[in-house]
Amino acid sequence: MTNIEQERWSRVKGRLRTTVGEDVYSSWFARMDLESVQQESVHLSVPTRFLKSWIQTHYSERVLSCWQAEMPEVHRIDLTVRTAMRCAAPAKEQAAPIEPRREDNRAAAHDLRVSATAPVSANHEALGGSPLDPRLTFSSFVVGRSNTLAHAAAKQVAEGRRGDPVMFNPLYIHSGVGLGKTHLLQAVTWAGNSGLERKVLYLTAEKFMYGFVAALKSQTALAFKEALRGIDVLVIDDLQFLQGKTTQAEFCHTLNALIDAGRQVVIAADRPPSDLESLDERVRSRLAGGLVVEMASLGEELRLGILKSRVTAARAHHASFEVPLPVLEYLAHSITHNGRDLEGAINRLLAHSKLNAQPVTLEMAEREVRDLIRPQEPKRIKIEDIQRVVARQYNVSRSDLLSSRRTANVVRPRQVAMYLAKTLTLRSLPEIGRRFGGRDHTTVLHAVRKIEGLVSKDAALSDEVESLKRQLQE
């Protein structure tokens, strides 16, 4: 990919993010990559068939229009599924063009095939499990300050034995893209199944959905439910993609049945339970009742450790591959987005070094990873963070902000918090109202306008609001 194409792709992603909103973009488009640009067509890729089908069905026009705003000559978007190194590599599929409002119901049926790559036996054919990557084990996971708790909790789950008391259930791990959630979940599955004492099943939310739909169509829903409830440890990845009221209801019943029976459930998503707005309130409540752990962004020390680990792994197949420490330090300092970019950087250096028979140098690294060095993204601020910081600033409790109390010492902090939620997050007025004790959107709008008017006249309040913004953005 040329630098010009990379710049165009960055602008298209920016338009798409603005058009659909931050939450929709994070859920459906964050893992979309640009593969190539031709005269009248653009080739994009996504990691799963489910994402491909969903984007084609629901967002084809928007993706195409965003590209046409950048390149009017583009009339076609080809969307394919990236193949990844798995225990059993999936068959390559032909690129399918995105066409406006194209309905593709074959994708669901195609994905109902049994995947035998996850090492678990089940009594229902839809529970073969999702593919596991043999590289994603505890031994290859690099531990740092941002993921210590998540790693420790996952390790404890993996080392448990059948009949042991469950300390936290479910274990819910959330983070942004590429920070290690899937690595930990697959490590739990590999380790849990190694002793053959417990049945540990790894499923993506996509696989769960398709398995349930297949069971309904084949009239084997009861067998599907019984097979799921016979699992000792159920591991669900990318829960934010769970769609459909019927499927969510079945997931909720399964979750309750497993937890009530003392079986372990481990879940990962890209946001905390309270932010999974598409999920039923009962599901969010049950998820929040377990151990919720956030994996924060990777610090520079952890990034350096990941890079060293990837070099060591590469040397298992390429013994002469060497990356000088100054190069690793440069990469750790410059590539700050996620672990996948770090791995991609090592893969590029390996390919360039081997194909050109050249040693890795700092100049080579600067040239090869230029497009991976992104501007520092602003911190994503959550409504819970705003409520916590405002409550601390005004010496009230978070429950006061959510309550119906109308005393002056509570009303003003609540209005300030609503104002900050509107100005610092992408949440809608109705959603902000719901997060402040179920208030109407007109209440939020009144609070926003009230504080907007006051900060222009009240210097003290203006200073307080700016101080709160700085605290939240640090």
Swiss-Prot record:
Region annotation (Domain I, interacts with DnaA modulators) ranges: 1-73
Chain spans, region Domain III, AAA+ region: 131-353
InterPro entries in the cross-refs: AAA+_ATPase, Chromosome_initiator_DnaA, Chromosome_initiator_DnaA-like, Chromosome_initiator_DnaA_CS, DnaA_C, DnaA_dom, DnaA_N_dom, DnaA_N_sf
Region called Domain IV, binds dsDNA, residue ranges: 354-474
Gene Ontology MF terms in the entry: ATP binding; ATP hydrolysis activity; DNA replication origin binding; lipid binding
Amino-acid positions noted as binding ATP in the UniProt annotation, renumbered to this chain: G178, G180, K181, T182
Region ranges (Domain II): 73-130
Keyword GTP-binding: no
Comment text on domains: Domain I is involved in oligomerization and binding regulators, domain II is flexibile and of varying length in different bacteria, domain III forms the AAA+ region, while domain IV binds dsDNA.
Family (UniProt): Belongs to the DnaA family.
Function: Plays an essential role in the initiation and regulation of chromosomal replication. ATP-DnaA binds to the origin of replication (oriC) to initiate formation of the DNA replication initiation complex once per cell cycle. Binds the DnaA box (a 9 base pair repeat at the origin) and separates the double-stranded (ds)DNA. Forms a right-handed helical filament on oriC DNA; dsDNA binds to the exterior of the filament while single-stranded (ss)DNA is stabiized in the filament's interior.
Subunit structure, interactors included: Oligomerizes as a right-handed, spiral filament on DNA at oriC.
Protein name per its UniProtKB record: Chromosomal replication initiator protein DnaA
Species the sequence originates in: Rhodopseudomonas palustris (strain BisA53)
Gene coding for it: dnaA
